[in-house]
Design a protein with these regions (language model features):
Chain A
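Short, conserved, GDST-rich strand-edge loop motifs in beta-rich repeat architectures
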Residues: 257-285
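Short loop/turn segments immediately following the C-termini of beta-strands
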Residues: 110, 120, 163-164, 209, ...
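A short beta-strand motif characteristic of beta-propeller blades
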Residues: 81-87, 131-140, 181-186, 227-234, ...
């Protein structure tokens, strides 16, 4: 992709030099102005292509209107290529869903807005990326900044949630490939993050970050169907919820919380300002936590129990999964690049029974985890390293993965963006600051 | 943080993240205070504004945090710093307000000034900039259909329910779905990143409750950066005295340069560079002419 970008830029540059008439203003450019530009270029030792781009951009019409479009009239600038461009052309692995019935593993890719399906046995010791057996990608898919992913092995369908850019749950089938419309979609609250299915109840649970809520829908809900119930309120202890697991075996909802909390009020320009909110509540930074709610909980209901405290080591916990045979919970602990395993019944300031962490593990910025009781494996999706790592199910400590699934060649960097939408320039360090 | 000369697919040179930072993974604004070497970040999901040392790295706590009942912050979205007058400004769409704090404010402190109310016209405030030289504050505020969508320019010391001294917006401006705004202190030129030219679409939900009477449309992907040619975004530049329904005086636009969804804009005034952020990446443009005094479109001489 970098090559494509540079090629595009170079082509534009050639086009501008070859076909573009110099504008009257460009013809009047004094030597001092061009020298100033040359000086700026020379100071940075920018490569030849970038130099050409900058010089061509300098010659764009200044008064005669923009050659490629009539709007805005008589404005300077126009279709100008950048001299530098930073982006990651490869997918990232975010959410993970494991189907041991059909031997598939599905990943959500927030960076390129795609869903990638691989054979469950994909990956190994190779330094090369593995080819997905199926992918969903393109404008028809309505995929935005997607986060969690879930699979229904019986119906051979997979679900994902747009965390931003189109507040939708979309559902695709194993038969879908490429730029295809979802089989069905459901509108969701803004900043929904994860989805978990409850096959026996025929329901699904959705976490909503900004509302500090879990919304429940019928599994096949479409369009603008309303949630059948919602856990939300001060008593719930839901605080920036991310990963969710609908534990039908124990009638519990298990949720990973980052700890950020504010009493959100409507902010959309379509809503009037809300003033009748009762007592003003302060925003808060709470510790990360795993909360357990009754599966039938509805409204402002406290959790049944909570794993929280210094000993837990929880640090921006993301996706979670439950090992029903070992009665354990695994959580992708993004903040310290680890996977932490707790006893399902733990409460309070509990220590993990196992932690997979360290240089040998190759876990970098994990966003999700999946347990395969059938094949005795544990999967980790690494946002920070273009990989998914597969471990023995009870792996512990600083251990190497059994195999690694790559979506880019080994050691390919990643920018780490998750919907970046602002920037600042640090004059002291000559650096660009970007919040996520 | 990326080196200014970073190009291609590169990892950041420095990252501030983790539980101890009190950051979240949802932040839509940032400001750098070059006089005091500090980074200022609004945390929408915690109703807070955090200040970090300029060289902060890894899982480090902020040096100051503005949060609490006196602050009146609910969901601060964007931030600016005025190091000359020692003020931090944030805008909160939930409160429909621009809120000004002392730069050294920490903890549960009341703002020095609040610009909010019907006369201000402010609603979904997604961009904010301060110009201590010309003594103005600029808020970029969106509205769905009708009403005022655009740049609201206030006196720097404006307080309470006051009308803006100038407003840039209207059909000729094509301002609709924009975000970050920046000011070149040398000229006062105003830079705005616009993701696309469609007005903000109505969401299906009011927070976690379905919106009454909401009907789905086929094109409800208003934040999409998929690059629809008819609604592509741009970086627009205005002169400091601009007012009314006017087109930009200077523009960077696509297609072909991956600028379909420019949400953020930052300036390197020394190098005459413009950094545009969006679509999980950023691009740098070298445009010295954008850092000169801009004449009205159609005038005979663009240069000073």
């Amino acid at each position: 992709m970098r090559r494509i970008l540079i090629s595009t830029a170079a082509a534009t540059c050639i086009l501008l030099f070859a076909g573009g008439e110099r504008s009257p203003q460009a013809n009047t450019d004094g030597p001092s102005e061009m020298t100033a530009l040359d000086d700026l270029l020379a100071e940075d030792c920018i490569d030849e292509v970038a130099t050409g781009i900058a010089q061509a951009a300098r010659r764009l019409p200044q008064e005669g209107g923009v050659t490629s479009d009539e709007w805005p009239p008589n404005a300077i600038g126009g279709v100008i290529p950048p001299i530098r461009s930073v982006s990651d052309p490869f997918p990232t692995f975010d959410g993970i869903a494991l189907d041991t019935v059909n031997d598939k593993v599905i990943f959500s890719d927030e960076n390129r807005h795609s869903l990638l399906v691989y054979d469950r046995t994909a990956g190994g010791a190779s330094n090369d990326p593995a080819e997905p057996v199926q992918y969903v990608f393109g404008p028809k898919t309505k995929l935005g900044f997607i986060a969690g992913v879930e699979v229904d092995p019986v119906r051979k369908e997979f679900y994902t949630v747009n965390n931003d850019s189109g507040d939708l749950l979309t559902v695709f089938s194993y038969g879908d490939h490429g730029n295809v419309q979802p089989r069905r979609s459901l509108t969701l609250p803004h900043q929904s993050w994860d989805v978990s299915l409850a096959p026996k109840r025929d329901e699904m649970a959705i976490t909503v970050q900004q509302s500090n809520a879990i919304s429940f829908y019928k599994r096949g809900a479409t369009g603008t169907a309303a949630p059948i119930r919602t856990i939300r309120g001060l008593a719930t202890e839901l605080e920036d919820p991310h990963g969710v697991y609908f534990d039908e075996a124990h009638n519990e909802i298990i949720t990973a919380n980052h700890g950020n909390w504010t009493q959100i009020r409507p902010y959309s320009p379509y809503d009037p300002q809300t003033t009748d909110v009762g007592e003003y509540k302060s925003g808060a930074f709470h510790p990360s936590a795993i909360t357990f709610h009754a599966a039938d909980a509805n409204g402002d209901v406290p959790p049944l129990r909570t794993i929280e405290g210094d000993l837990t080591g929880l640090n921006w916990p993301m996706g979670i999964d439950v090992d029903q045979t070992r009665d354990e919970i695994a959580v992708a602990n993004y903040g310290d690049s680890s996977v932490r395993v707790f006893r399902r019944g733990d409460r309070g300031n509990a220590q993990a029974v196992r932690v997979i962490r360290g240089a040998l593990t190759q876990i970098v910025g994990p966003v999700s985890v999946a347990i395969d009781t059938k094949n005795d494996e544990l999967w980790v999706a690494n946002y920070g390293d273009h990989t998914a790592s597969v471990f023995p199910r009870t792996a512990s400590g600083n251990v190497r993965p059994k195999r690694v699934l790559r979506n880019a060649p080994k050691d390919t960097p990643t920018c780490g963006f998750t919907n970046a939408s602002a920037a600042a320039y640090d004059t002291k360090r000559d650096a660009i600051l970007v919040p996520n | 943080m990326f080196a200014r000369l970073a190009n291609g697919n590169v990892a950041p040179s420095r990252v501030i993240e983790g539980q101890a930072t009190n950051l979240s993974r949802t932040m839509h604004g940032i400001a750098y205070d070059e006089i005091n070497d500090e980074i200022i970040i609004p945390v929408a999901l915690s109703g807070a504004v955090l200040v970090f040392k300029g060289d902060a790295k890894g899982e480090v706590p902020p040096v100051r945090a503005i949060q609490g009942t006196r602050t009146r912050l609910v969901r601060p979205h964007t931030v600016a710093v005025d190091p000359v007058n020692n003020e931090i400004l944030t805008a909160d769409p939930s409160m429909r307000a621009i809120v000004v704090f002392d730069r050294m404010a920490s903890g549960n402190v009341a703002p020095k000034r609040v610009i909010s109310g019907p006369k201000t016209g402010l609603l979904d405030i997604v961009g904010l900039a301060a110009d201590p030289i010309r003594n103005v504050i600029i808020g970029a505020s969106r509205k769905g259909n009708g009403d005022q969508v655009g740049l609201f320019i206030f006196d720097r010391l404006a307080n309470g329910d006051v009308a803006p001294k100038a407003f840039i917006g209207g059909p000729k401006s094509k301002l609709a779905h924009f975000r970050q705004v920046a000011i070149d202190p040398g000229t006062g030129n105003i830079f705005l990143a616009q993701q696309n030219t469609r007005m903000k679409q109505m969401e299906a939900y009011v927070l976690d409750k379905p919106r009454e009477g909401f009907k789905l449309k086929d094109d409800d992907d208003d934040d999409s950066d998929s690059g629809r040619l008819d609604t592509m975004g741009f970086v627009a530049v205005y002169a400091p005295d601009d007012n009314g329904d006017i087109p930009p005086r200077a523009i960077i636009k696509g297609p072909g340069i991956r600028l379909a969804g420019a949400a953020g804009v930052a300036l390197n005034t020394k190098k005459k560079e413009i950094i545009a952020v969006g679509g999980n990446g950023f691009q740098t443009f070298l445009l010295p002419d954008f850092f000169r005094a801009l004449k009205k479109p159609g005038s005979t001489n663009q240069q000073p």
